[in-house]
Amino acid sequence: MSNAWQDVSQVYGGCSFFAAWGEATGSGGMLVGRNLDYAGLEQLAGFQSINFYKPETGYRFVTVNYPSMVGIMHGMNEKGIVIAKAYSTVVPEETTVDGVPFTIMLRHALQYGGSVDEVVNIIKNTPRTVGLNILVADAARREAVVLEVSAYRMTVRREDSARANFIYSANRFLTPYLKEYQEPGWLSSAFREARFEKLKQAFSSELKVEDAVRILRDKEVEDPDSPALLPSIQNNATISSMVFDPVRLELWVSAPGGLLTTDQVFTGISASEVWRTGQPPSPVGFIPATETTPVVRAWQQVMTAAGASDQRKKELLTPVVERYPAAGYPLYLLGVACLRTGELQAGLGYLEQCVISANLPDPYYLLAAHAWLGVAYDTLGRREQALQHYRAGLAVELWEEVDPMVLQICQ
C-alpha cells in the first residue's frame, strides 16, 4: 500500500518541475529542477534518503525517496534519462484503481527507458490509474517533453519552437486534448506557470545549478518593500527540492526535514561516481542556504502559518501584516482565522483591507476573500454588504478553473 495509496485514495498534492537545455544552459548541457509539494508526506520528510539502484536487468538509477516506497516520483538513470511527476486532476471517468500504481510505473519507465521514445512507449502501454503530468528529459538528445496522461488518454507536450530549450509544468494540462478531461480544482498552477515564464526570461542563457535552485526557491518577491507573501514555485507544501544534471549524472538535493528545507543547503552528489566505485557518495559541492532577509523570514513565517491552527495563524501573522500591511495572502489567512474563532470585526477588517488595498497577484485569493466577507456580513444580518461582496467575487477574472465551492457561495 505504500506504493499504491495515492492511486487508491486519489489524494492529490502539488509539485512543479522544469527542464532547460542547449542554449538555455550556456554550456549546451541540461538541467532538471523539481519541487515535491506534498504536505501529506511531511512526517516522512525527515527520513528522506537518496537511493541508488543496480537492478539485475535494465539501467541503474537513483531517486530521492521515503521509507517503504519502492516506486518513484522522480529519478535519473545511467543513460541520462530524468523522470518527474506532478498530479493533474481529471474527471472521475478518467481514473481507475484497475491499473499499475503510478510510482511503480515510473520506476519501470526509469529502469528500462533509455530514451524519450522508450519511456513514452512504456507509459503508453502501461495500464494507468490517475491524471499526471510526467516530465521526461533525455541528456543524450538534449530533449525534454511533458506527458499529459489520465487512466485512458495520453498526449506528449513539446515546446512549440524547434529552438525551444525550456519546458515546465505545474498541476494542470496545457494541451487542448487533455484539458477537456480536467477536473476543476485549484492548486495555483496558472500562477506558478506565470512565474516559470518570467524566470525563464531572467535565466535565458547560461543557466547553472545555482540558478536552477533559485528558480525552485522562487517566492514571487518582486518588490521587497511591498511583497504579496504568497505561495509560489516554493510554497507551504514543498517538502523536498532537487536538481538533476543528467549530462554529468549529478543530482543536487535539499536537506531532509520537510517544510522550508528548500531554503536550506543543497548537497551535490555524483551518481556516476557511485555507480563506478560502488562506494557511498561523497559530496561534489554545496549550494548555500537562502539568505534570511526580513522579507524571506516573513515569507517563511506565512508559509508556516498556512498549515497551522487558527490560533497559531493569528500569533504568526499579526506581526507580519503590521510590518507588511499590503501583503494580501497573510491578510487573507489572518482574516479567515479571525472569522473562524469568532472575532468577526477583526476578521472583517483584515479581509476588507485584503480586497481594497492589498498586493494579491493570484486572483483566486481575491475571490475567496470576497466569499468569506459575504458570508460574514450575512451572519451579521447585513445583506446589502454581503451581496456587494458576492457580486465582486463573481466579477473576479480567474486564471484557471477552481474548486466550485467558493464560486457557489458567491452565486
Segments from the language model and where they lie:
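Alpha-helical linker/edge segments of TPR/alpha-solenoid repeat scaffolds
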Residues: 374-385, 410-411
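Fold-independent oxyanion-binding glycine-rich loops
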Residues: 34-36, 66-67, 86-87, 139, ...
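Boundary/linker segments of alpha-helical solenoid repeat arrays
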Residues: 327-330, 356-367, 395-409
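C-terminus-biased signal that marks the final domain/tail of proteins
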Residues: 1-14, 110, 114-144, 152-154, ...
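Second-shell loop/turn segments in exported
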Residues: 95, 105-109
